[in-house]
Each structure stands twice: as structure tokens, then as C-alpha cells.
Design a protein with these regions (language model features):
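Short, structured secondary-structure elements
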Residues: 2-190
């Protein structure tokens, strides 16, 4: 730290700087919300133009793939195209968000990051009975559980006052790793 005591200048790390809200750029050719205005301004500054608006079927396919991992079926497409009400798109998205497929799709990212697997993933590769925790994650996404609660219950759900069974189950996250049983199993770990 000698360089500091000798008067060296340094900037505070960006992570310790409070974010400030920027006013959206003025004027718009196509933007419908503040994020669009920022994107439009940057595109114009770079001499670029946005892609043309996607067709209705492409938009439905994109949002369906994003939220459920599956394309819309023919019945869903026909129902959408036959509906002329002004909020048909919003209702389509709401149905996707209310579907169990939404939780499955969103949970995939978390399960992959947490290295979930149905086996121990080691040389003997035995079954790993972590599916109750996997199902808890799916339900957490489908019930729109707040992120702070989602992480707290996985890290320390068993330590919460009057912990419910599902909160204890959430701590399966802490056992979600490779396991080998060469030296036998320790009962307290299970």
C-alpha cells in the first residue's frame, strides 16, 4: 500500500458507485418505451437501422420459445390469428407465463448452473435422488418466488424459524455435487 501513502491517485471501483438514472434520449422514430429510445439512439449514432418488425407468427414463435422452450402449436396460432382484440398478444404471453412449461424452461438455466444431475457423475455413476430439489426449483419459478427468498431457502431453508418441509427440501441445493462412495457413506451426511 506504499503507493497509496505516497499520494497515488486511484478511482473507486465501479461496483461501489451508486447507479444513476439516465434520462432517455429525446425523439423517436419507432421506440415505444425508454429502453427502445436508448437502443434507437445508439443505432442512429452507429449509422445502423433496426430490423423490420417480425411477422406475427415469428413474434409468437420467439416469445413461445423464450418462455416455454417450445414453439406454439397450430391451435394456439390459429386462436391468436382469429382474435382481433387489442390485447391478444399480452394474453398470449400471460398464458405462457402461467404454464408449467414456463417453470421448466426457466429452471433449466438454474439447474444447469447448479450442475444438477440424475446421477452422481463419478466413476460408479449411481442414481442421485435429487429430483425432489429439482421439482422444488420448478415450482419456485412457476409460483414466481422472489429471488431473495429463492436463494435464502436453498442456502439455509433448514435454519429458518419453523422451517416447512419444502424449505428444508430447498437445501438440496447444498448436496448437488459429485459424490463418490468408495470409503462408504457417512449417515450424518444424508
Amino acid at each position: 500500500h506504499q503507493w497509496i501513502t505516497e499520494g497515488a491517485r486511484y478511482e473507486k471501483h465501479w461496483a461501489f458507485t451508486a447507479p444513476s438514472k439516465s434520462a432517455p434520449p429525446k425523439g423517436s422514430l419507432w421506440g415505444r418505451n425508454p429502453i427502445d429510445l436508448f437502443i434507437e439512439a445508439r443505432l442512429l449514432a452507429e449509422g445502423l437501422k433496426p430490423q423490420q418488425r417480425a411477422t406475427t407468427v415469428k413474434r409468437l414463435r420467439r416469445v413461445s420459445m423464450d418462455l416455454s422452450g417450445l414453439p406454439p402449436n397450430i391451435k394456439e396460432l390459429d386462436s391468436f390469428l382469429d382474435d382481433s382484440s387489442p390485447n391478444v398478444y399480452e394474453r398470449f404471453v400471460d398464458r405462457l407465463l402461467a404454464s408449467p412449461r414456463y417453470g421448466e424452461r426457466m429452471a433449466t438455466w438454474w439447474l444447469d448452473s447448479a450442475r444438477y444431475g440424475d446421477s452422481h457423475g463419478y466413476d460408479n455413476d449411481l442414481e442421485n435422488a435429487q429430483w425432489p430439489w429439482r421439482n422444488w426449483v420448478l415450482e419456485a419459478f412457476n409460483s414466481n418466488m422472489p429471488y431473495d427468498r429463492f436463494t435464502m431457502e436453498q442456502l439455509a431453508g433448514d435454519l429458518l424459524p419453523n422451517a416447512r418441509h419444502d424449505q428444508i427440501l430447498a437445501t438440496g441445493f447444498n448436496r448437488n455435487h459429485r459424490i463418490q462412495t468408495e470409503g462408504g457413506a457417512i449417515d450424518e451426511e444424508w
